[in-house]
């Protein structure tokens, strides 16, 4: 009964939850029904706490729906479902004994999955270098709605490298925290296991190492090195585009690492299938584990980032100043940090207190550029071009989905990227009421949670408008 009951719950949860959430949190759960108690086993404490906090009501509701009057008690445990005792071993024949006698010789011929790297080899200029930045850890990564899923996945991978989500593929625009998460995973893996061999690198470094190995006739050493790591963290995988020899070598490295249960984490500025110049067989493999989008931070996260960075610099940043900066600089974390560094430097040089007027003066060129780039008119033109419709359609009364959805997206973008009020936005979209704009913003926020396509479109448009 446990398998059928939990299977029914799983099927419904898969329909109700976004695909990425279901794959990350619910699918790994194992179930056992015993004495009218359904025990759900989570792979680790982090998953257990998350499921109990976020999905307990959903699970209880479905248990009541599918169990009728005999609703089982629900409990959670960390671990795996107990394994059923094996059947008694069959009687062995003489042929079985003869076959077993040859097994040790066969095993002796097998090579270990984790190969060793000969550090004394002079054939190739490759030595173990982790390149993991010790400054980038989970405890100084600012969590928000835009990166929550990516952070949770990274934490799970660091707790169970090679087992949870392999490969993990993080994608999103420049300066959103993907590289920070790569380093944080690397640091956490080494903290948990000081002997772990973790390597972080930009994809171009992989290409450089391969070229150098070919020049030095040391390609076998190159292969042994990259296939012996416990975790390979590669940034900006899109730079493999049109490098056929590098793609060929990485394809075989990828397969070897996965076969050996060694962790792979990749980042890119776009969704795997949208990376041009990369072979389909590689793009397909990029999606074998878990693919998570890292989106531009929302206002609250931008404020939290500024406050955290100011605290790191031992600088008091008034709340109203943090909100002033965060409302005007929206594209990425790197831009926020750069702006704050400029404000702090100006304050140190002049000895003046950090106020809104002071920030407006210190960042006047940057703020002027942002206000010039992102206007409602610019948003309308960009959205219309993206969806291959006319700006006049966005301003019209047409309600067909092919027009209504882009219009709602454009309104949501105007609220996110400009300082205009809801009535002003409504007026710019054909004289619509502010409640229409509010409904559009809420609808798009909901769809970004439920629809990968809408989430992707929204991220692409923000990236275009902020570039």
UniProtKB/Swiss-Prot annotation:
Q: Which UniProt keywords apply?
A: ATP-binding, Cytoplasm, DNA replication, DNA-binding, Lipid-binding, Nucleotide-binding
UniProt entry tagged with the keyword Nucleotide-binding = yes
Q: Where is this region: Domain III, AAA+ region?
A: 131-347
Domain I, interacts with DnaA modulators: annotated span: 1-87
Q: Superkingdom of the source?
A: Bacteria
Cellular localization per UniProt? Cytoplasm
One biological process term from GO is: DNA replication initiation
Residues that hold ATP according to the record: 175, 177-179
| Gene Ontology terms for molecular function | ATP binding; ATP hydrolysis activity; DNA replication origin binding; lipid binding
Say where the protein is mainly found: cytoplasm
Q: Where is this region: Domain II?
A: 87-130
Annotated InterPro entries:
AAA+_ATPase, Chromosome_initiator_DnaA, Chromosome_initiator_DnaA-like, Chromosome_initiator_DnaA_CS, DnaA_C, DnaA_dom, DnaA_N_dom, DnaA_N_sf
Q: Where is this region: Domain IV, binds dsDNA?
A: 348-467
Q: Which CDD domains match?
A: AAA, Bac_DnaA_C
Q: Which NCBIfam families match?
A: DnaA
The task this protein performs is described as: Plays an essential role in the initiation and regulation of chromosomal replication. ATP-DnaA binds to the origin of replication (oriC) to initiate formation of the DNA replication initiation complex once per cell cycle. Binds the DnaA box (a 9 base pair repeat at the origin) and separates the double-stranded (ds)DNA. Forms a right-handed helical filament on oriC DNA; dsDNA binds to the exterior of the filament while single-stranded (ss)DNA is stabiized in the filament's interior.
Written domain comment of the UniProt record: Domain I is involved in oligomerization and binding regulators, domain II is flexibile and of varying length in different bacteria, domain III forms the AAA+ region, while domain IV binds dsDNA.
Q: Which family does it belong to?
A: Belongs to the DnaA family.
Q: What is this protein called?
A: Chromosomal replication initiator protein DnaA
Q: Which species does this protein come from?
A: Vibrio cholerae serotype O1 (strain ATCC 39315 / El Tor Inaba N16961)
Organism classification: Bacteria, Pseudomonadati, Pseudomonadota, Gammaproteobacteria, Vibrionales
